[in-house]
Amino acid sequence: MYKIMWLLKRKPGTTHDHFRHHYETSHSVLGQKYFGHLIQSYQRNYNTAREQDGGGARASDYDCVTIWEMPDAELVDEIYRIMADPVIGPIFLEDESHFLDSSETRLVRCDTRDTGPGDGAEWFRHLASAR
């Protein structure tokens, strides 16, 4: 499985609600229209933490982490080819100007490995030996 993670910030002056609404009703719809056939999953994960959570971790400055999942990296090249189209590319750029601070967008390419959830047996052995 191959993943692309987009770290996204809203445009200055844009509320969280407007950012989310525009992304869900316009930008993600464009993504589905033009390259939805190439991806297995298109997730938008909105930041709900606005201040430091427990454990000392600082809240992220990003408003959304978008994740595309696909079987292999070659499909990313096809998406980039579509986005470079002289008709399609400007459609996305114009739409982004309504809600996204593109200068702050970050891209993370991931070659994903999943160990699964586990069965918890090791934790229970640890608890039993602590008694």
What label would you give each PLM region?
Residues 1-131:
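Macromolecular interaction modules
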